[in-house]
């Protein structure tokens, strides 16, 4: 069934709201991208959005742009270490904004939205040994 992002047809009391119009195509939503860590090569998908614009969805990520003190590096993503959005995403290697990923140069926190922006940007985390 389609994902509809319009107003609910129910009132807080549970009563029905009768719409004075039909549902519109612009109110349709889409399934989330669920960007995963790639094993072979990166996979992107171009989606037509409202107004004929385009949005790039990153389906599988192989590299991340990791920034450390203003200097950026393109490094390979190894795995997802932690994800505050959903703990099951760690097991499934799904990258979202705020996820902590393991890269070739260390751990980094994702600052971009891969399913919306089509790229993984991250900031290196300073590891403090106690």
Curated annotation (Swiss-Prot):
Keywords, comma-separated and alphabetical: Ribonucleoprotein, Ribosomal protein
Gene: rps8e
The name this protein goes by in its record: Small ribosomal subunit protein eS8
HAMAP family registered for this protein in UniProt: Ribosomal_eS8 (MF_00029)
Alphabetized InterPro entries for the sequence: Ribosomal_eS8, Ribosomal_eS8_CS, Ribosomal_protein_eS8_arc, Ribosomal_Se8/biogenesis_NSA2
GO molecular function annotations of the record: structural constituent of ribosome
Annotated signal peptide: none
Subunit text: Part of the 30S ribosomal subunit.
Taxonomic path: Archaea, Methanobacteriati, Methanobacteriota, Thermococci, Thermococcales
One Pfam family here: Ribosomal_S8e
Annotated family: Belongs to the eukaryotic ribosomal protein eS8 family.
GO cellular component, one term: ribonucleoprotein complex
Keyword Transcription: no
Keyword Acetylation: no
């Amino acid at each position: 069934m389609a994902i509809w992002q319009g107003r609910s047809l129910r009132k807080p009391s549970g009563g029905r709201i009768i719409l004075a119009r039909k549902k519109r195509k612009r109110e349709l939503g889409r399934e989330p991208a669920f960007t995963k860590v790639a094993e072979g090569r990166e996979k992107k998908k171009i989606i037509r959005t409202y107004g004929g614009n385009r949005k790039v969805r990153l389906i599988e990520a192989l590299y991340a742009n990791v920034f450390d003190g203003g200097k950026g590096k393109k490094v390979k993503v190894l795995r997802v270490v932690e994800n505050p959005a959903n703990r099951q995403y760690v097991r499934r290697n799904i990258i979202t904004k705020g996820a902590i990923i393991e890269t070739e140069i260390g751990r980094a926190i994702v600052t971009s939205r891969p399913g919306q922006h089509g790229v993984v940007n991250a900031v290196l985390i300073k590891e403090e040994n106690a």
